Amino acid sequence: MAPQTISLLWAMVCVSVYTRANRVVAPIHEPQNWKPATVDDFTCRTGFNLDFDSKFIKTKALVLKRVGQAKVKGYLCMKNRWTTTCETNWLYSKSVSHHITHVAVSAEECYNKIRDDASGNLKIESYPNPQCAWSSTVSREEDFIHISTSDVGYDMYTDTVLSPSFPGGTCKLKTCCKTIYPNIVWVPETPAQTQVRDALFDETMVTVTVEAKKVVKDSWVTGATITPSVMEGSCKKTLGSKSGILLPNGQWFSIVETGQITIQPKGSVEEKETWVNLINDLNLSDCAETQEAKVPTAEFTVYKTESMVFNILNYHLCLETVAKARSGKNLTRLDLARLAPEIPGVAHVYQLTSDGVRVGSTRYEIIAWKPTMGLDKTLGLTIVPSGNRNSETIKWIEWTRTDDGLLNGPNGIFIADGKEIVHPNLKMVSFELETYLISEHSTQLVPHPVIHSISDEIYPENYTIGGKNSYIKIHTPTAYFWSGIHWIEGAVQKLFIVVVATALIGLFILVVWLCCGCCSKSRPVRNQKWE
């Protein structure tokens, strides 16, 4: 890896420090096929952002842009029947009465009223006038509909609208909802599902890796607003009437395209399959009711950029370790930690012994790093969605002792002083760099993103890992005695501009003066006689 690239990566890392929980990819059980490691056993497995050879699908999906209740615009719609009754006797004595009756109203009648009001076709409300007849009772009635705006809440988990006017306070989302009043219903202003989609969801592109034409537990999903996540531990959850997948990290997405989806290796079309068939192979269970979806925070962009930088940086550090092994140099525990994979799945595990390094194959998962000492040394707990199954304790039984007296576990993990389980690369893999950089490196960072004082070549100096005197110099700025004192720097810059401008003006005046002098000498004097 070029020194310039290393420096640039470290600069990006230092600028985007973001502390997360200690979640690492670790082996969940010990292999049964240990063997002495040879040079060919030291390999690097690329992370999701680097694995360009893997097959994947890109498709449109809905993702949450907000959680909790949304607002659905609508109307309360009421229908009344106005009746006029005219009663006469044989002497033609007339009696007229009026009364109003509440009657049931349909959604169609409500929408007709909404359209009429919008078009200005207003109907004047008044009692009808019946034609009275001798010695008879005649009635005439006319129906009038009233509408008034009424926005209601919406619960995306139950797909119901919420209002005190509804019986029980809720109504399953549909074209019309009854209220506690027999003659009043609620109708949405526009199709409710459209309002819900616009309020809760954004449409984006997602990428999902596939193996053997299937989405498997080791498949990864990522997108413009989806944190890279493994599919294992996901469950099915319907939000806003949209069937989707809740990832282990709490993010939710729903595929928009239900037809054929292209499977691509390196961007070329290979074969087509439907998303339904792909995802059904996972046999996902339904999520627990208590499991809630999350929306990426404002830190998401920083985290995703940082994770990509870390994947690239870790991959190249791993390549350096492989080159070190193939050149016959001794490997350290930190080297073994760099060889560990960054994504779940089956991969090599390395363990230091008194005779060298041994290697085996095992399964890796994302775990919460919570080491505890005891008869069974615990590394941590598996990360699973709450409600699906209990977290599993990850233990490492067989620890090997080396000549330095330390007990060694998987991938460079060791027990220090018989009291503490130490991950040599934890600060790197868990993105907790701030303390690591301060304690292990002396860093020089540009206080502002300026380039005028940075030399053209960016390179690290004395780049070593470990040791009290080791450090990484991010870049080599052109230093002046006023560097770091901003008001002096500004004054010097302004003074420099004034001096240059004055010099240019003076040069211009000098040129003009010389030109004028030359012209005056060459011009003949008036009335002068030439001999």
Curated annotation (Swiss-Prot):
It is found in: Virion membrane; Host membrane. SUPFAM superfamilies: Viral glycoprotein ectodomain-like. Pfam families: Rhabdo_glycop_CD, Rhabdo_glycop_FD. Residues 1-21 form the signal peptide. Residues 22-492 are virion surface. GO terms for biological process: clathrin-dependent endocytosis of virus by host cell; fusion of virus membrane with host endosome membrane; virion attachment to host cell. Keywords: Clathrin-mediated endocytosis of virus by host, Disulfide bond, Fusion of virus membrane with host endosomal membrane, Fusion of virus membrane with host membrane, Glycoprotein, Host membrane, Host-virus interaction, Lipoprotein, Membrane, Palmitate, Signal, Transmembrane, Transmembrane helix, Viral attachment to host cell, Viral envelope protein, Viral penetration into host cytoplasm, Virion, Virus endocytosis by host, Virus entry into host cell. Glycosylated by host. Gene3D superfamilies: 6.10.140.740. The chain crosses the membrane at residues 493-513. Residues 514-531 are intravirion. Its main location: virion. Attaches the virus to host receptors, inducing clathrin-dependent endocytosis of the virion. In the endosome, the acidic pH induces conformational changes in the glycoprotein trimer, which trigger fusion between virus and endosomal membrane. This is Glycoprotein. It comes from Tupaia virus (isolate Tupaia/Thailand/-/1986). The gene is G.
